[in-house]
Amino acid sequence: VDFSRLSDGQKSMLYLSLVLTSQSIYHSVRNSEDNSFDIEKLRPPIFALIALEEPENSLSPHYLGRVIEALKQTTQHNDAQAIIATHSPAMLRRVSPEHIRYLRLNGLRTTMIRMICLPDKSDDAHKFVREAIQAFPEIYFSRLVVLGEGDSEEIVLPRILSAKGVPVDSSAITIAPLGGRHVNHFWRLLSQLEIPHITLLDLDVARFGGGWGRIKYANDQLKKFEPEKILPDN
């Protein structure tokens, strides 16, 4: 097939395949697994930096997954690193939070760079927070995050906000039902990323652990995170 007849996605995949294949050949020759090439003439690079800009513009989500897996295999060696710039939740869902670097413009129009800080691995909250972040990667692109209790908020809140003239998608609002668990870790994460957020709590008297205990739990967590914002004793 003539190169000019390929789509943008196919051209991207072809170019990336050539780069990754050349890296694979370098590794095979260097490790004496392939004698078809003379390493002196091949002259493999000491270090390769593979940069992809918004691959989601021309590739389907399933191809994105294949690209990430191929890059992971290539970067297992110490002679290559991959950087992907993306606005796609589908891409972030396939990447561990520890490998994400969050870029955002501040009020001075200067780019700030943040790492994703998770609870300590020995903490029970680590797994929950990690899975929640991967389940709702939209939070990285949000102007406002609403931390809700259950699935009903995902149905009701968008309709209420739309009726008030604040469409969820147009306003870049993400509603994340977390069941009220480990809210302090999400407060810390969102505050670090400078993403505005609101926490909704309901009494849920009929549920185990419900009632005013829910409010007390959130207030106790707030005392650890931002003591100046806790509820007054009276």
Give the residues covered by each predicted segment:
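Switch/communication elements of ASCE P-loop NTPase nucleotide-binding domains
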Residues: D2-A135
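Acidic, divalent-metal-binding catalytic cores of TOPRIM
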Residues: R101-N234
